[in-house]
Amino acid sequence: MTTQNNPYVYAEAIQYQLANIVTPVPVYANFNRNYAKQPQFLTWQLRNVHQDVYTGGIQSNKGIDTPIFQISIFAQNKADAFNLSNDILQSLHGYSGQFGGPDGFFIAKADVHWLYNSYDNELGLNQIFLDCMIYVPA
C-alpha cells in the first residue's frame, strides 16, 4: 500500500524552497508579531496534507499527494510585497522537479494561486496571501 509523506518532510521542503526563492528575506514557519519589526518577511503554514482515498478491490493505487500551504508576504513597502509575490509566482507556479533541495522530493507540478492583498494599519505592513498546491506522485 502506498503511503503519503510525513508532514514534517513537507515542512522542511517548503522552508528550503521558499528561503531559496526570496533570499535574503527571512522565511518563518509561523507568524509572530515580533517579526513585524522587520521591513519584509515571509511566513508559511501547511494547511492540508491530502491523498485521495480509493475504495474497492485495489487499495494500493492512491494517486498523488496534494499538500497545500499558504504563503503570507509582509513588507513595509508595497512594491517590495508585490515584487516578492512575483518572485514566488515566477519560481513556483508551474514548477516541476526536485522540491526542497537535495533532501527533498520530486513534484509533478506546483500551482500558486493569489488569494488577496491587504494592508495592516496597526502594523504598517502590506500583506499578500498566496496558496500553493504541490502534486507529489505517491
Q: In which residue ranges do the predicted regions lie?
A:
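Oligomerization/assembly interface segments of phage tail-like spikes and tubes
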Residues: 63-76, 125-136
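Small/polar-rich, solvent-exposed N-terminal microdomains that initiate assembly or binding
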Residues: 1-61, 79, 83, 95, ...
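Acidic-leaning, charged glycine-interspersed low-complexity segments
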Residues: 92-138
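Short, solvent-exposed beta-strand/turn "edge" segments of beta-rich domains on protein surfaces
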Residues: 59-62, 121-123
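A short glycine/small-residue-enriched secondary-structure motif
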Residues: 44, 60-67, 107-108
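Mid-chain, well-packed structural core segment of small domains
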Residues: 74-91
